[in-house]
Amino acid sequence: MLAKPYRLRKRQDFTAVYQQGKRWNSSHLALRTYPRRRSALALDGVKQSALNSREPPRIGISISQKVSKRAVVRNRIKRQLRAILRGLLPYLQPGWDLVIVVRPTAVECDYQQFLQELKQLLSEAEILHGY
C-alpha cells in the first residue's frame, strides 16, 4: 500500500485526471497525468510553482472487471504495480496526479514487464527523472 499522501482517493480527483489530463499508452497499461493546482491565490506569498513542487505526486490505479472477473487476479496486478511505484516514488516529479489504467491484456504480464512499461510511460510523460 502506498502511504496516504501518495494516494489518489477521491472520485473528483480521478475525474479531473480523466477529463483534463494527458494520456500515454502502452500495450498493457495507460498512464493519465494531470498537474495539481491549488486555488488561484498563492498562500502566504508563496509562488504557485513553489507550492506545487512541495506536494508529493498522488497515484491511483484503475482496473476494471474487463481485465479479469476474478478479484484475486485484479488484486495481484494492483499489488505488483504498487510495489513498483514504491520503488519509483523518489524519482517522480512532485505536484502531479497520476492514474494508471490497466488493460485486459495485462493478465499475462509479469512483474518485469510492468516495471519496464511503467518506467517507459513515466519517462515519456517527463515525470520520471534521475532513473
From Swiss-Prot:
Q: Which EC numbers characterise this protein's activity in its record? A: 3.1.26.5
Q: Choose one Gene Ontology CC annotation of this protein and give it.
A: ribonuclease P complex
The record's Gene3D superfamilies line, in alphabetical order, gives: 3.30.230.10
Q: Molecular function (GO) terms listed?
A: 3'-tRNA processing endoribonuclease activity; ribonuclease P activity; tRNA binding
The family database entries (InterPro entries) matched by this protein are listed as: Ribosomal_Su5_D2-typ_SF, Ribsml_uS5_D2-typ_fold_subgr, RNase_P, RNase_P_CS
Q: What class of enzyme is it?
A: hydrolase
Report which reactions are catalysed by this protein. Answer: Endonucleolytic cleavage of RNA, removing 5'-extranucleotides from tRNA precursor
Ordered alphabetically, the record's keywords are: Endonuclease, Hydrolase, Nuclease, RNA-binding, tRNA processing
Q: Which cysteines are joined by disulfide bonds?
A: none
BP terms from Gene Ontology: tRNA 5'-leader removal
**Per its database record, what is this protein's job?**
RNaseP catalyzes the removal of the 5'-leader sequence from pre-tRNA to produce the mature 5'-terminus. It can also cleave other RNA substrates such as 4.5S RNA. The protein component plays an auxiliary but essential role in vivo by binding to the 5'-leader sequence and broadening the substrate specificity of the ribozyme.
Question: Which NCBIfam families does this UniProt record tie to the protein?
Answer: rnpA (TIGR00188)
Subunit and partners: Consists of a catalytic RNA component (M1 or rnpB) and a protein subunit.
Name the family: Belongs to the RnpA family.
Name the UniProt record assigns to this protein: Ribonuclease P protein component
* Gene source species: Cyanothece sp. (strain PCC 7425 / ATCC 29141)
